[in-house]
From Swiss-Prot:
Organism the protein comes from: Alcanivorax borkumensis (strain ATCC 700651 / DSM 11573 / NCIMB 13689 / SK2)
N6-acetyllysine found at: K606
Protein name: Acetyl-coenzyme A synthetase
Annotated binding of Mg(2+), by residue: V534, H536, I539
Gene this chain is encoded by: acsA
EC number of the protein: 6.2.1.1
Keyword Nucleotidyltransferase listed: no
Taxonomy of the source species: Bacteria, Pseudomonadati, Pseudomonadota, Gammaproteobacteria, Oceanospirillales
Binding site for ATP: G384, E385, P386, D408, T409, W410, W411, Q412, T413, D497, R512, R523
GO BP term, example: acetyl-CoA biosynthetic process from acetate
Annotated residues for binding of CoA: R190, G191, G192, K193, T308, S520
GO cellular component entries: cytosol
UniProt modification remark: Acetylated. Deacetylation by the SIR2-homolog deacetylase activates the enzyme.
Family classification: Belongs to the ATP-dependent AMP-binding enzyme family.
Amino acid sequence: MSQVHIHPVPADYKKQTLMDRETYDRWYSQSINDPGTFWAERAEQLLDWKTPWDTVSEWDFNEGRAAWFKGATLNACYNCVDRHLPERANQTAIIWEGDEPDQDKHISYQQLFEEVSKFGNVLKNRGVKKGDRVVIYMPMIPEAAYAMLACARIGAIHSVVFGGFSPEALKDRILNAEACALITADEGVRGGKTIPLKVNADKALDGIDCVHTCLTVKRTGGDVDWQAPRDVWYHEAMADASSDCEPEWVEAEDPLFTLYTSGSTGKPKGVVHTTAGYLLNTALTHKYVFDYQDGDIYWCTADVGWITGHSYIVYGPLANGATTLMFEGVPTYPDASRCWQVVDKHKVNIFYTAPTAIRALMGLGDAPVEQTSRASLKLLGTVGEPINPEAWEWYYRVVGDSRCPIVDTWWQTETGAIMIAPLPGAVDLKAGSATLPMFGVQPGLMDPDGNELDGAASGNLVLKASWPSQIRTVYGDHQRLIDTYFSAYKGCYFTGDGARRDEDGYYWITGRVDDVLNVSGHRLGTAEIESALVLHPSISEAAVVGYQHDVKGQGIYAYVSLMAGKEGSEELVKALRDLVTQEIGPIAKPDLIHFAPGLPKTRSGKIMRRILRKIAADELDSLGDTSTLADPSVVDQLIDNRQNK
């Protein structure tokens, strides 16, 4: 392994941070040895409760069950908005930076309270009640956050669907969630282009009976079809709504939201997060991982359609009374300096983005960064996938001027909040390492036979004890939760990731070990992409694997077998990419398509994906044993025609 570059925390920086190493060690030890006391103290410190809990936690990983703060009642919206009004009514809660550099808004906590309260009444006036599911299919505009908080206020369960998903993908999620309402916009705007959200929503709703309301925000004023009485303009409904909307006090374990994530079986799974544990852990991690202090301007570049947007644009920051920035655009529009121009414009102190964005910006050179000041920055973060040390060093040296610590955070949709990360004032940084576990997190490394590995080792990453923001179930299919996360290693949660632990106890995430790709920080199931490809009448079979991509982290490599009499062509490549875009969305479009005369299969008919991964990676000297294949000659043909030479 190449030499690891260690970056000690500067002494003057340590003095200003919320947590030093001694405090981290003490808190972490208590969180493992006396979790009841630890989490009770954090719950009192960070959240407001209507009624107290009976028990802090009870869990059984064999059954995939966990409950935190049972007996307590609270409201997530109240904790994110109302309780801040006495001291923060005039403080900016959300800075919105539009796609064009001359568009921005500052929304105070008082304004946020009024908008969300009205929005809650709009939903109630349309018959949405506690426990109902509401799908949100929105661009990155303040109304997306209002919608989430309004649902939480009235006890409805939101399910945000990323605006880049296709009508078919949206339809699947609406049906699975059994939603009664959809909140969307006429169009989204991103990188100077419009996204036809209402058109997509109309296609998705075609033939669906459960949705009685489609509330539409006017973002661009573009032409849209209208279906009364289902369709309602947001601005018209809000004009008549009262701002008096009492929060619905819910049980600690009542669901806050469902968020769909890719699985290895091809059918997206609805990850259910509940109110108290999720809100507590997002508040805790936002405060200490980002060393958030009063007055800081915090910017997470994620989309609210992903878990990072839920936890670290909306719930975590607002629970802490922070100022959070929402960005509608992309890092390279109108030019490659945009991110750093936004940092200077709004005096951003904390910047949290994905390695994919860092690598893309690194590829455009230092000049777009260096023509800006960035003097306000004090902390940088990364999320979504492992960051390679070269990109880490560039981010540290060029973006942060070698003075801003980087928090490389590992977590998942299912974990709800950051699980492994360095605390900026407490530990020395190693480029590319996610570092140390957060409070209450007990990681373990397992070998393929299920034996736990001690000391410095590499293996499959598991979590050995429950944590407050843990996934509670897969919506409508608890058995799938058990099969996916709690069956591989008895009594442990299996993350699906591989990891290495070094001699200092630092963790290094090595990537997925299951059939899920991590493309630009977005999880995509290979089976879902394969299912889309074989819809084409020329394709008999498809197998999708990941390969190393300089910008995206992982690229999508699709092997496709043709029907008899069909031939591969550039036209067919385009048609297949368009088909995947239509079925899932542009993020799932294959980078490389390899027309294969056959796929390597065992005699029982199982595709040997290990071999396909090796060929896609151009690692031809480590294919391993191919003698068990039904037709070993297929491998030579695949090698000769490989797309990633």
